A protein has these predicted regions:
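Conserved ABC ATPase "signature" C-loop
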Residues: 252-253
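A short, proline-enriched helix->beta-strand linker immediately N-terminal to the Walker B motif
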Residues: 193-197
Length: 282
């Protein structure tokens, strides 16, 4: 383990002390939150995920990198049960959500799945905010309508999140009145309002606007400091290198390399080295 690791805060780089890194490792080496074993997924004749296995520990930040079309987003959608798997096992805190039976993937009953789904949050690449809802309405809608939280409690949660994410003056704004970075922060607030144990990000900085990319990366860094368990699909190689506890490289539906940032970026196999070199030159 290195003595210090650079981290992202806004558009600047800072250093994370050895003590801070050790604290992160102490948190992550205990409880397994999410476990996926031998996951398979096909769309028609196209095999998108081929025998993928992944475990995520409490407080861990896992970055998933790789070329477009490698199955990264599909992996996230299977983990959050937005897509049904065709094979393999999915469990959270040891409770099985899906498993193989007689060569087919079987899911738990609706009541069990509803409870398990409460543990996951997904921040979409394109925000997916309701355009006809205000920022406040976007954030409180799911807690009230899905989880049965009172409107008062949902608003209290929302105000705390808006303040935390620097959006307290945008509660009554509509998505079209916000910048890309602000919309993505609202999307993060909406996911956090459900109080998930694991937060998934699908290309959170895909728009390549340096100003709002810095805004979003700063929020993710803040969540990491608070030991939020996160799985992040990203093309931001420097970000993945600096912030992650573990990095996974995927290509053609397979995990080609997995390890700490030091292992993946410091000693990549030939294919990973080629990919990293090409992406970091862009």
């Amino acid at each position: 383990m290195q003595d210090a690791r650079e981290i992202v805060r806004g558009a600047k780089l800072y250093f994370c002390s050895q003590t801070e890194i050790q604290e992160r490792y102490e948190v992550t080496m205990n409880q397994i939150y999410l476990e996926m074993n031998h996951i398979k997924k096909t769309f028609g004749k196209l095999e998108v995920l081929k025998d993928i296995s992944l475990s995520v520990h409490k407080g861990e930040v896992v970055s998933v990198i790789g070329p477009s079309g490698s199955g990264k987003s599909t992996l996230l959608r299977c983990a959050t049960m937005l897509e049904k798997m065709d094979g393999g096992e999915l469990s959270f805190l040891g409770e099985k959500a899906a498993w193989e039976e007689n060569g087919k993937c079987v899911y738990a009953n609706k009541k069990q799945l509803k409870e398990i789904r409460k543990n996951f949050g997904l921040v979409f690449q394109n925000f997916n905010l309701f355009p006809h809802y205000t920022v406040m309405k976007n954030i409180i809608d799911a807690p009230v309508c899905v989880d049965g939280v009172s409107k008062e409690e949902a608003k209290e949660r929302a105000w705390k999140l808006l303040k935390q994410l620097g959006l307290s003056d945008k509660a009554d704004a509509y998505p079209y009145q916000l910048s890309g970075g602000q919309q993505q922060r609202v999307s993060i607030a909406r996911a956090l309002a459900l109080q998930p144990k694991v937060l998934f990000f699908d290309e959170p900085t895909s728009a390549r606007d340096p100003e709002w990319t810095g805004e979003v990366l700063r929020v993710i860094r803040q969540l990491a400091d608070e030991h939020m368990t996160m799985v992040i699909v990203t093309h931001e190689m420097q970000f993945a290198k600096e912030l992650s506890d573990r990095v996974i490289f995927m290509e053609k539906g397979l995990v080609c390399q997995e390890g700490t940032p030091e292992e993946v970026f410091g000693n990549p196999n030939a294919r990973v080295k080629e990919f990293i070199g090409r992406v970091m030159q862009v």
